């Protein structure tokens, strides 16, 4: 049984003024009942609502457990999480969303499993309360990951996850934009478990998840998997990914564009193999170039994936212009 000295909670925030006060209240209340030191690191990812003001006020309170990190602009959830990882000091780190769909009251459940010796504690949402678009897109991504990397987990998209410090330190060594943290973490350890957690309908604000973010997520997922597969000389697996994506893109392209063109159905169908071939060629060239750039340039120069405006910690505000 492991005993952790300190817990770090990482919460990325973007325009969550409606849920932020309730989020902080419930998270602090949950953590204060634990027999462990803790910090709650909330990263504002360039919000343009009142989230910044709320965070500043909460972090500047006497004996506040809130560490507020303010990024210079909206870099995306991944970069915000990486900023939180870098400035965390706990030997156990838990990530969670700010929308309260996964309740903070589930945190002790993750700690209990981490104490059993698991390096990574994933979660899957029971009776998921999202709309059909999020459910289908999440299911699609989970299927792609399971087929390609062979790690059978039910829900790679749930943000409520726990990592021990060794895993966090290894993740920070990558320092790239196009990595998918759950996949990377799972490749760094075989000592992994996935547990069920509660999931509620979104009560505050609206979801930031849309088609554009789904495409970006698939892009990051694609390059993250491919980078690891190329290092392991598994080119066939990459080819399978390309075929899968090509077929998927062809179907989408067919429904969006071809159905609007007045052509015989036979000629419309003929376009599909052409699209697949072109997509495969282009994707293969792009991925090889991308990975070569990563290998020869990113390793030589650690490019920043985010810039911090300021940090408020221990009731003290500090301006900061670096990562």
UniProtKB/Swiss-Prot annotation:
<comment type="pathway">
    <text>Glycolipid biosynthesis; 4-amino-4-deoxy-alpha-L-arabinose undecaprenyl phosphate biosynthesis; 4-amino-4-deoxy-alpha-L-arabinose undecaprenyl phosphate from UDP-4-deoxy-4-formamido-beta-L-arabinose and undecaprenyl phosphate: step 1/2.</text>
</comment>
<keyword id="KW-0472">Membrane</keyword>
<feature type="transmembrane region" description="Helical">
    <location>
        <begin position="238"/>
        <end position="258"/>
    </location>
</feature>
<dbReference type="Pfam" id="PF00535">
    <property type="entry name" value="Glycos_transf_2"/>
</dbReference>
<keyword id="KW-0812">Transmembrane</keyword>
<keyword id="KW-0448">Lipopolysaccharide biosynthesis</keyword>
<keyword id="KW-0808">Transferase</keyword>
<keyword id="KW-0328">Glycosyltransferase</keyword>
<dbReference type="GO" id="GO:0016780">
    <property type="term" value="F:phosphotransferase activity, for other substituted phosphate groups"/>
</dbReference>
<dbReference type="InterPro" id="IPR001173">
    <property type="entry name" value="Glyco_trans_2-like"/>
</dbReference>
<keyword id="KW-0441">Lipid A biosynthesis</keyword>
<keyword id="KW-1133">Transmembrane helix</keyword>
<dbReference type="InterPro" id="IPR029044">
    <property type="entry name" value="Nucleotide-diphossugar_trans"/>
</dbReference>
<dbReference type="InterPro" id="IPR050256">
    <property type="entry name" value="Glycosyltransferase_2"/>
</dbReference>
<comment type="pathway">
    <text>Bacterial outer membrane biogenesis; lipopolysaccharide biosynthesis.</text>
</comment>
<dbReference type="GO" id="GO:0099621">
    <property type="term" value="F:undecaprenyl-phosphate 4-deoxy-4-formamido-L-arabinose transferase activity"/>
</dbReference>
<dbReference type="GO" id="GO:0046677">
    <property type="term" value="P:response to antibiotic"/>
</dbReference>
<feature type="transmembrane region" description="Helical">
    <location>
        <begin position="269"/>
        <end position="289"/>
    </location>
</feature>
<dbReference type="GO" id="GO:0036108">
    <property type="term" value="P:4-amino-4-deoxy-alpha-L-arabinopyranosyl undecaprenyl phosphate biosynthetic process"/>
</dbReference>
<keyword id="KW-0046">Antibiotic resistance</keyword>
<dbReference type="GO" id="GO:0009245">
    <property type="term" value="P:lipid A biosynthetic process"/>
</dbReference>
<dbReference type="InterPro" id="IPR022857">
    <property type="entry name" value="ArnC_tfrase"/>
</dbReference>
<dbReference type="GO" id="GO:0009103">
    <property type="term" value="P:lipopolysaccharide biosynthetic process"/>
</dbReference>
<keyword id="KW-0444">Lipid biosynthesis</keyword>
<keyword id="KW-0443">Lipid metabolism</keyword>
<comment type="function">
    <text>Catalyzes the transfer of 4-deoxy-4-formamido-L-arabinose from UDP to undecaprenyl phosphate. The modified arabinose is attached to lipid A and is required for resistance to polymyxin and cationic antimicrobial peptides.</text>
</comment>
<protein>
    <recommendedName>
        <fullName>Undecaprenyl-phosphate 4-deoxy-4-formamido-L-arabinose transferase</fullName>
        <ecNumber>2.4.2.53</ecNumber>
    </recommendedName>
</protein>
<dbReference type="GO" id="GO:0005886">
    <property type="term" value="C:plasma membrane"/>
</dbReference>
<comment type="similarity">
    <text>Belongs to the glycosyltransferase 2 family.</text>
</comment>
<keyword id="KW-1003">Cell membrane</keyword>
């Amino acid at each position: 049984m492991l005993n952790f000295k300190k817990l770090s909670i990482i919460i990325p925030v973007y325009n969550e003024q409606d849920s932020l006060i309730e989020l902080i209240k419930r998270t602090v209340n949950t953590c204060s009942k634990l027999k462990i030191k803790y910090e709650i690191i909330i990263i504002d990812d360039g919000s343009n609502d009142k989230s910044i003001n709320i965070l500043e006020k909460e972090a500047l309170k006497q004996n506040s457990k809130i560490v507020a990190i303010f990024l210079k602009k909206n870099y995306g959830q991944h970069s915000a999480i990486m900023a939180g990882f870098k400035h965390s000091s706990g030997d156990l780190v838990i990530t969670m969303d700010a929308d309260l769909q996964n309740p903070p009251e589930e945190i002790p459940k993750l700690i209990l499993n981490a104490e059993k010796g698991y390096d990574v504690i994933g979660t899957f949402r029971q009776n998921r309360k999202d709309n059909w678009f999020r459910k289908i897109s999440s299911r699609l991504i989970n299927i792609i990951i399971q087929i390609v990397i062979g790690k059978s987990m039910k829900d790679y998209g749930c943000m409520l996850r726990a990592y021990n410090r060794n895993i966090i330190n290894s993740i920070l060594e990558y320092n790239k934009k196009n990595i998918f943290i759950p996949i990377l973490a799972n490749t760094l350890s075989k000592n992994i478990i996935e547990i069920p957690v509660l999931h509620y309908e979104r009560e505050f604000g609206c979801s930031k998840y849309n088609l554009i973010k789904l495409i970006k997520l698939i892009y990051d997922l694609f390059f993250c998997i491919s980078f690891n597969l190329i290092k392991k000389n598994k080119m066939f697996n990459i080819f399978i990914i390309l075929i899968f994506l090509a077929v998927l893109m062809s179907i989408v392209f067919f429904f969006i564009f071809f159905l609007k063109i007045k052509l015989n159905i036979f000629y419309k169908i003929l376009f599909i193999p052409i699209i697949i071939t072109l997509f495969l060629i282009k994707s293969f060239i792009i991925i090889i170039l991308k990975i070569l750039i990563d290998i020869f340039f990113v390793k030589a120069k650690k490019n920043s994936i985010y810039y911090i405006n300021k940090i408020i910690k221990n009731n003290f505000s500090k301006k900061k212009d670096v990562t």
